[in-house]
Amino acid sequence: MAITPEKEKALAATMAQIDRKFGKGSIMKMGEASSRLAIEAIPTGSIALDIALGIGGVPRGRVVEIFGPESSGKTTLAQHIIAEAQKMGGVCAFIDAEHAFDPVYAARCGVNIDDLLVSQPDTGEQALEICEMLVRSNAIDVIVIDSVAALVPRAEIEGEMGDSMPGMQARLMSQALRKLSGAISKSRTVVIFINQLRMKIGVMFGSPETTTGGQALKFYASVRLDIRRVETLKQGQEAIGSRVRVKVIKNKVAPPFRQAEFDILANEGISREGNIIDIGTELGIIRKSGAWFYLGEDRLGQGRENVREFLKNNPALTDEIERLIKAQALTNPTVIAPSVDVGDDDAIFEE
């Protein structure tokens, strides 16, 4: 049914009044905001994870949570997202609540340390206030908070050791996210919370694992990534890295429950070349015959490690293979990022 002229006039007057009171753009027709509907993304540094996320990376203007066990690659993944944002000309900040930031390793992951903003706050309130100020500046592309578990409320720091303060951190996170969510959306900043796992006591059925900081972050996060180490990579008897699996537990911008696997090497972070070999082989772009790998009729090398070194020394060829993978995989991500089954009673997935 077409809107009547009287209704059209009343609606226009009301919208004009709202704009005058709350600012231009406070209300608009979706057709007028079509340019804002497209979701921009920042790559993660792993092409497999970019494809699993469905939009080519983590979404701008959203909250992202990365959680998993210790030494699973949470901070490494966050640092690669920072590196990718910097390559796009972005400004990034790292709020180091754990006071454990390693600039040498971050540089190996591709982070431009000279341009990275780093803060090591004393309390959880200070960390979240700094985050809010950076978001409202509209000048930051990525903010990483490492980690939620280290956001200790001021009252707990000023109190005596052993004082019981139940729920204080959860209340702090809930209040902060209520204030931050709108500002994050308007600023197009990606705010990444790194989180740790804890065990629930007395759980008889389902997973006893849960994340710290209460329930608020689970609701406000548009993307939640569960990262786990599945294998230790060795060269002879020496451990040189880890094979990790990332499950997209929640995704508000694309279909969720997909997963990706990639290598994290001790001296360079996420192995881009290893990722390209794995996915290129799955898609048939790279052909494997015995121990040899081929691109079309051209021989790349014998053995995965030799091919990885060859691609590392030939960045133009690596870029071309990556372009072919993205053109094929992003149109059909389920080919290499299959959906995974998540239990309804798993504590991590509760919302």
Swiss-Prot record:
Coiled coil: none
Keywords linked to the UniProt accession: ATP-binding, Cytoplasm, DNA damage, DNA recombination, DNA repair, DNA-binding, Nucleotide-binding, SOS response
UniProt GO cellular component terms: cytoplasm
Protein localization: Cytoplasm
Entry binding sites for ATP: 68-75
Pfam families: RecA, RecA_C
GO biological processes: DNA recombination; DNA repair; SOS response
InterPro entries: AAA+_ATPase, DNA_recomb/repair_RecA, DNA_recomb/repair_RecA_CS, P-loop_NTPase, RecA-like_C, RecA-like_N, RecA_ATP-bd, RecA_C_sf
GO molecular function term, any single one: damaged DNA binding
Function: Can catalyze the hydrolysis of ATP in the presence of single-stranded DNA, the ATP-dependent uptake of single-stranded DNA by duplex DNA, and the ATP-dependent hybridization of homologous single-stranded DNAs. It interacts with LexA causing its activation and leading to its autocatalytic cleavage.
Record-stated family: Belongs to the RecA family.
Protein name, per record: Protein RecA
Native source organism of the sequence: Chloroflexus aurantiacus (strain ATCC 29366 / DSM 635 / J-10-fl)
Taxonomic classification: Bacteria, Bacillati, Chloroflexota, Chloroflexia, Chloroflexales
